């Protein structure tokens, strides 16, 4: 897998007074955070959330909006229960998937020693005491199936010290309904202690509701297996890394249908960040790093033919396509950012093959600022390799003047 080294040269401004002001740390708290909810079931609108920092209350205020996919004025709404079907409901609507934390192991002193009822000390005898900033307090997130009519809940990992979703960053993408609603597919790393902490061997498991049995679908792969998703025809795709213990390995899209497994991106020298099945079940849209940015791609699914999957880059520019919200009749809704713009919703048109901005939550804020200029440069290293460098020039940059320079170099295998 190709590795990238990025360097950003940020040139600090002079503080001169201009018609517009330059960005300050305090200004950052005025930026509205746009988060997509999804395309409505009718397919003609997008629901999204706008979160604004509240400095006085030390909190965040959120509002919901709906906007036509063709463009227009956003409309504030109170909820979207009648607009978007809950994806965690079974196809027949009788059961619902959700996750919650369950106490499994005793870790606190007061749990291990009953005479120390006030002890909040954490006691560990092996690794897996913390992942990033998340401490293992003896509780594990488990997936549950809830009977909508009776409220009865089934813990798919009852009594087991395993996580689903995965800690610390996993979410609802770690568990989905099977196509017929009779089974649940979930991601879990069924290891404990030091073995859990040093392994990347997550697997995708199938839980059958009728027999209450569990089957490991990805037992043959010893690296990460994550993000299971089904096409409208019932084929399952997921993200897979081959090398056990190497959490920055190349991420591929693998498809399983009728017992036949195909790696759609094995021949492609890039790594996949996330993906979504096309409505036609013949293509998969995905996002991946490309030359210092993150772009939108499409790969076809040739099923069981000997044809090499064809990969097409759909977007290109000095911006990142961060996520795919959904497909509508004629295109995709995605989120996009750049070094001068926070997240906004964009519409990708299949015919024009262009991105068009859909939401404009921060336009007034940007228009009040003198923004920096961003330049992309490729520099030859001593060993003849190309190194990407982002040069960020301050607002009102004067090439005849000298400026203090800040060098920011980001390396390591996990840089995008």
Residue locations for each model-derived region?
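Bacterial Sec-dependent N-terminal signal peptides
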Residues: 1-23
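Beta-strand-rich domains and repeat architectures in extracellular enzymes and scaffolds
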Residues: 26-60
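Conserved beta-strand position repeated once per blade in WD40 beta-propeller domains
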Residues: 36, 86, 174, 227, ...
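Residue-level detector of Asp-centered blade-edge/turn motifs that repeat once per structural unit
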Residues: 41-42, 91-92, 179-180, 231-233, ...
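Hydrophobic beta-strand positions that form the internal "hydrophobic ladder"
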Residues: 43-47, 96, 184, 234-237, ...
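A flexible loop/linker signature enriched in serine peptidases of the S9 family
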Residues: 50-63, 78-85, 99-142, 159-171, ...
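Short loop/turn segments that connect beta-strands within beta-propeller blades
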Residues: 68-72, 147-151, 208-212, 257-260, ...
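Serine-hydrolase catalytic core recognition
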Residues: 322-416
